[in-house]
Amino acid sequence: MQESLKKMWSGRFSGESSELLEEFNASIGFDKNLYREDIAGSKAHAKMLGACGILKPEEAAAIVAGLDAVLAQIEEGKFEFKTADEDIHMAVEKRLSELIGSELGGRLHTARSRNDQVALDFRLYVLRQNEQIARQIREFIATLTSLASAHLDTLMPGYTHLQHAQPVSLAYHLLAYAFMFKRDFERFISSHERNNLCPLGSAALAGTPHPIRRELVAQELNFAGITQNAMDSVSDRDFALEILFNISVLMTHASRLCEELILWSSQEFGFVTISDAYSTGSSIMPQKKNPDVAELIRGKTGRANGNLIALLTTMKGLPLAYNKDMQEDKEGVFDSVRTATSSLAILNAMMKEAKFNEQNMLAATKKGHLSATDLADYLVREKNVPFRTAHFITGKAVAHAENLGVDLSELDAAQLKSVDENLDENAVKFLNLHASKEARTSAGGTANASVRKQIEELESWLSKSGD
């Protein structure tokens, strides 16, 4: 038989594979990333076959030793991945057979299909990445919490519609992101727990007549249990969709933060100075200092979203059980994982070195009439004015301030009284911006007491989530 026909599945074929097919069909170029998982799964499978008497103990031991040798060759850069090997499973098995002999090497695939093998490999990879990304998220939450602790009294405008809305602290603003990322952490952990089941032993789609014990493989690989239906096991890519979705939401949160860093670092805002270590210059304009890291994270978010939509679209029309379309599941996941891990690493480092310009933030609170809601609330609480009427009166006060060319917080008692008789001298103290921030004592509010509780909650969570 010619070399091109010497494939694990070549017995049924009498013709040669087209070179076009060889290139088009092969996944070895990217699924070689799964070599650790593939070898770990094969070792667990061989041990189980030995424990069940399907292989002799010495055969199982020889296969495991051979797989260790293959792993060492790959990690030492001595393993040549070839397109003709088709995928990582065939590449590893072929090299194993070269090392220990084809008769013994050929026994490894007993009671196993590439369908459940790839389901195992890919699931192991995704579970490992769930843990890695969750660790990085936790580290970033710790950074945000530390920054918040340092900026309890840094006053800045809170925004809606990118317009000045109400005074808040920088600590409060940063904590909003900390709680966003905490939800991201919880999504990755939840997905890990839900998908921590071993599919190996499902074979092609219907299980196997060999007397295997799937739970032994699950235990060897530290799974919580085994999947319950073989057809579902080889068809399932929910775990891949989940990590793509979780990364998309994570990157969306990172993108929103980066958008603000981009705005805040501009001359128009001047709220933050990004370290030179995480900025770049212009090839023509000598004065430029560009927030390229933040812009790249913002841009890479679209890439992560695209990977999610691509796999959703691939999976939506597939009949049970395995289809070759599912080979398209991996590159997007690999790409999104690289995107998420690299983005989190550099975002965390950049935030640690960011310098917030407290005076510029404070100056910005003197624009936009940030105390307007407090004035309306005063009328409701102290003068028993219906809120809609209070809203109207306060709007008139804002218009009066603008006619005078000042901020609402700068109006004196006489100027307020000229707008409406309910705006007496007591109303003036409700225009104080620090007092405005401190007045919001409701749970989750901007008052320092509330913000400290939020910080304490996160610090307590951080101490427990590292277990």
From Swiss-Prot:
Its main location: cytoplasm. One of its GO terms (biological process) is L-arginine biosynthetic process. Keywords: Amino-acid biosynthesis, Arginine biosynthesis, Cytoplasm, Lyase. InterPro entries: Arg_succ_lyase_C (IPR029419), Argininosuccinate_lyase (IPR009049), Fumarase/histidase_N (IPR024083), Fumarate_lyase_CS (IPR020557), Fumarate_lyase_fam (IPR000362), Fumarate_lyase_N (IPR022761), L-Aspartase-like (IPR008948). PROSITE patterns: FUMARATE_LYASES. The keyword Amino-acid biosynthesis applies. Signal peptide: none annotated. GO terms for cellular component: cytosol. PANTHER family: ARGININOSUCCINATE LYASE (PTHR43814:SF1). HAMAP family: Arg_succ_lyase (MF_00006). This is Argininosuccinate lyase. It comes from Campylobacter curvus (strain 525.92). The lineage of its organism: Bacteria, Pseudomonadati, Campylobacterota, Epsilonproteobacteria, Campylobacterales.
